[in-house]
């Protein structure tokens, strides 16, 4: 008897990846605690847990791409789930970064007597916001314009143009990351140099980490676009990457104003 599906939802097949991801998370957590408390085998368990999680992420997303690209299970109704999930994830990341910027603002607006009652603290050599920070900001904002160009190209059915736009986006992202690394290397202070160093590296480093994740996301989208796996009707993965990237480039304005400019002028 042939089974027929009379709805637009995707009933997924049994998968081992949820339980494998859970086991990887368990191993990572236990291994991390053991490593921090100098228990024997903690580093090994932590490494195995991280490898297990990365492997699970790879094969799980591979299966999702197969279900959408080759099997056609991602109808318009199914596509709403990843869209809502991506928006919820980005909102949670906004809250995360807001906490770091709030910590920096709190310390700068009400400096304590332990740091001399001034901001930046006495003895801290700060970075000039008119140099690399000022250069890096328009670079990242330009990458946001490039990813919008790629989106319009996909909607217009211009596959090659979309690939070129994604290459431009990734190139600008790599330039930004390179300058960020140069900035860290040349910084006259470290993360342990008072509350200024702690909030600076925590906030800008967390944002830089998001840039790296977004760059990997866009590289995968560029490869899929080159292989012809995205169309103007089916490109939810790219939409999620574009939304994430716009979040990353807009957020850049906050550390530039609240950390580089406020703490460096």
UniProtKB/Swiss-Prot annotation:
One of its GO terms (molecular function) is cytochrome-c oxidase activity. It is a multi-pass membrane protein. It is an enzyme of class 7 (translocase). GO terms for biological process: mitochondrial electron transport, cytochrome c to oxygen. One of its GO terms (cellular component) is mitochondrial inner membrane. It catalyses: 4 Fe(II)-[cytochrome c] + O2 + 8 H(+)(in) = 4 Fe(III)-[cytochrome c] + 2 H2O + 4 H(+)(out). The chain crosses the membrane at residues 16-36, 41-61, 81-101, 137-157, 162-182, 200-220, 245-265. It is found in: Mitochondrion inner membrane. Keywords: Membrane, Mitochondrion, Mitochondrion inner membrane, Translocase, Transmembrane, Transmembrane helix. Its EC number is 7.1.1.9. Belongs to the cytochrome c oxidase subunit 3 family. Component of the cytochrome c oxidase (complex IV, CIV), a multisubunit enzyme composed of a catalytic core of 3 subunits and several supernumerary subunits. The complex exists as a monomer or a dimer and forms supercomplexes (SCs) in the inner mitochondrial membrane with ubiquinol-cytochrome c oxidoreductase (cytochrome b-c1 complex, complex III, CIII). PANTHER family: CYTOCHROME C OXIDASE SUBUNIT 3, CYTOCHROME C OXIDASE SUBUNIT III. Component of the cytochrome c oxidase, the last enzyme in the mitochondrial electron transport chain which drives oxidative phosphorylation. The respiratory chain contains 3 multisubunit complexes succinate dehydrogenase (complex II, CII), ubiquinol-cytochrome c oxidoreductase (cytochrome b-c1 complex, complex III, CIII) and cytochrome c oxidase (complex IV, CIV), that cooperate to transfer electrons derived from NADH and succinate to molecular oxygen, creating an electrochemical gradient over the inner membrane that drives transmembrane transport and the ATP synthase. This is Cytochrome c oxidase subunit 3. It comes from Vicia faba.
